[in-house]
């Protein structure tokens, strides 16, 4: 978790998720005895619970129904704060793709004081989302190699140092080969780095518009940055997501003022990007000297791992915000549906639905990620919801161009009436078309308007425990929903899958700050954490049974 995730730029009067949950609780006994009561209402699944980490597989100390189903029949291990990863005894681990490893298959690494040119030829820093394709080509995001990681200090002192940090960001594409029980990089023409200065293309409704016009490299856009989660398409490409791009922009001109649109995207002023301070040496990231460069970031970027000479393509029909994931699902009629969260407090959940069968679109020379409609989620207290269209066809947005809506997606979603969420993170599809979304947390507190502090309200829902006591939940939760019409419809039913404060074993609360999530299609849901854990322990990877909500 990073400080920029904890910003709030949403000043709209839209309802928060807590508003919805509280209203629902008023209508009926909601979450009495835990998240499972809500789950039973619409989905027929059992309450979230945990297994005893000190007993063998199949023993369950959690409340509610559901002995170990066999789907997650390994030994659960207790929380710990050790210096090295701890894993269940049924598994083994090995390290692959460390920072600085060369992409030539030699297995060697450049020194810690490598040059920017060497960094462009080696694995980047700050690993995040990834996908391993069937031919064992891996695409791996590098989200946030900081100055301290690179130099052991917080400042940069030259353009070369800026270039080195820039080269550590982006995506690594490598072909792997199995060696015993692990993998190694093999020499392959597809191996490459995609970084902040890699040439890129734009497609979709914003391509060719004045929104992307800059003074520097006007017709030669470059780069991807802060690559967090990801997705993959049915046609074999990788989609990577630009998240906290605001933290790289600023200005040496301290009189520069951010526009309202920039403030809505969390660029508050000339010192916004002072942590990295690229603008001190690279004029491209100085918004006084190079307006609109920020509007070239915040997109979903498509990469073809089989075509190393093809430019990455920024798909603007998917909207611009702090994308945390782009989960691509094949919906009814073989239309592709792309789900994304916007990872900042009080931001929204989105989905894009292609205009037609993806194979037919491609046969006509069109990208399924360019032709379609973007929607934003509005949750309702009765456990239903609607996807509000973000286009001029929506009467609330009729006065805006489609290009404006895609560049200023957050502002458009404000107007459309989206529900404020608790830092929406990764989204995954499980069995029976159920979608799952992690909401890390929302640690905002009610500010004091009398002191001039904005009255931001956390969207976190509280819940009532089995004894009927109200329990605050600042540790995040996981929701699930099912869309109408095989993912393509504009209505849905939603409910909780788990509330972090409630999932416990005999030692107490089991996890907090859920972040990454992936369902394997066999009834297992994998959840990784990123942030404060119970007892200040290490982050962790958990597995839950989709049907029983049992966690290990």
Task: Walk through the language-model features, giving the residues of each.
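Beta-propeller fold recognition
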Residues: 161-163, 167-169, 182-193, 347-412, ...
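Beta-rich, blade/repeat-based domains predominating
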Residues: 123-133, 221-233, 320-331, 418-430, ...
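Beta-propeller blade signature
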Residues: 169-177, 296-305, 352-353, 474-484, ...
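N-terminal secretory signal peptides
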Residues: 1-25
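Short, conserved, GDST-rich strand-edge loop motifs in beta-rich repeat architectures
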Residues: 143-166, 246-291, 354-357, 441-472, ...
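Blade-edge beta-strand/turn elements of extracellular beta-propeller
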Residues: 82-98, 106-118, 181-218, 303-320, ...
């Amino acid at each position: 978790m990073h400080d920029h995730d904890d910003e709030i730029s949403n000043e709209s009067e839209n309802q928060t998720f807590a508003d919805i949950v509280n209203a629902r609780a008023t209508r009926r006994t909601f979450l009495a005895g835990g998240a499972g009561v809500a789950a039973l209402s619409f989905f027929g699944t059992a309450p979230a619970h945990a297994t005893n980490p000190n007993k063998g597989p199949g023993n369950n100390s959690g409340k509610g129904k559901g002995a170990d189903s066999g789907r997650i029949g390994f030994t659960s291990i207790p929380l710990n704060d050790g210096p090295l990863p701890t894993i269940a005894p049924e598994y083994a681990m090995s390290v692959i793709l460390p920072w600085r490893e060369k992409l030539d298959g030699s297995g060697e690494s450049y020194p810690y004081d490598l040059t920017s040119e060497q960094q462009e030829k080696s694995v980047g820093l700050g690993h995040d989302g990834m996908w391993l394709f069937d031919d064992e080509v891996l695409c791996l995001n590098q989200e946030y190699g900081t100055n301290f990681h690179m130099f052991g200090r917080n400042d940069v002192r030259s353009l070369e140092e800026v270039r080195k940090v820039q080269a550590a960001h982006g995506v690594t594409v490598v072909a792997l080969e199995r060696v015993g029980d692990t993998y190694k990089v093999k020499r392959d023409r597809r191996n490459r780095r995609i970084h902040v200065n890699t040439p890129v293309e734009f497609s979709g409704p914003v391509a060719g518009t004045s929104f992307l016009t800059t003074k520097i490299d006007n017709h030669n856009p470059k780069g991807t940055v802060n690559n967090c989660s990801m997705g993959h398409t049915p046609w074999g490409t990788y989609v990577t997501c630009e998240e906290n791009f605001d933290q790289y922009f600023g200005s040496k001109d301290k009189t520069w003022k951010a526009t309202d649109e920039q403030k809505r995207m969390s660029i508050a002023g000339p010192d916004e990007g002072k942590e990295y301070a690229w603008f001190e040496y690279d004029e491209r990231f100085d918004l006084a000297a190079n307006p609109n460069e920020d509007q070239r970031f915040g997109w979903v970027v498509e990469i073809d791992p089989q075509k190393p000479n093809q430019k990455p393509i920024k798909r603007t029909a998917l909207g611009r915000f702090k994308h945390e994931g782009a989960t691509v699902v094949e919906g009814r009629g073989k239309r592709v549906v792309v789900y994304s969260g916007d990872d900042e407090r009080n931001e929204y959940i989105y989905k894009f639905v292609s205009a037609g069968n993806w194979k037919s679109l491609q046969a006509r020379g069109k990208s399924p990620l360019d032709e379609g409609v973007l929607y934003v989620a509005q949750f309702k207290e009765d456990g239903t919801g609607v996807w509000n269209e973000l286009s001029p066809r929506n009467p609330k947005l009729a006065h805006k161009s489609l290009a404006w809506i895609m560049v200023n997606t957050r502002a458009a979603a404000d107007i459309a009436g989206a529900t404020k969420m608790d830092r929406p993170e990764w989204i995954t599809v499980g069995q029976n078309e159920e979608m799952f979304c992690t909401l890390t947390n929302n640690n905002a507190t009610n500010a004091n308007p009398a002191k001039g502090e904005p009255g931001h309200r956390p969207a976190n829902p509280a819940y009532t425990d089995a004894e009927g006591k109200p329990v605050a939940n600042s540790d995040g939760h996981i929701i699930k929903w099912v869309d109408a019409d095989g993912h393509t419809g504009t209505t849905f039913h939603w409910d909780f899958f788990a509330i972090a404060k409630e999932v416990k074993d005999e030692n107490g609360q089991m996890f907090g700050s859920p972040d990454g999530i992936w369902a394997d299609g066999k009834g297992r849901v994998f959840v990784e954490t990123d942030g404060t854990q119970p007892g200040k322990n290490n982050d962790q990877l958990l597995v839950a049974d989709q049907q029983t909500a049992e966690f290990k």
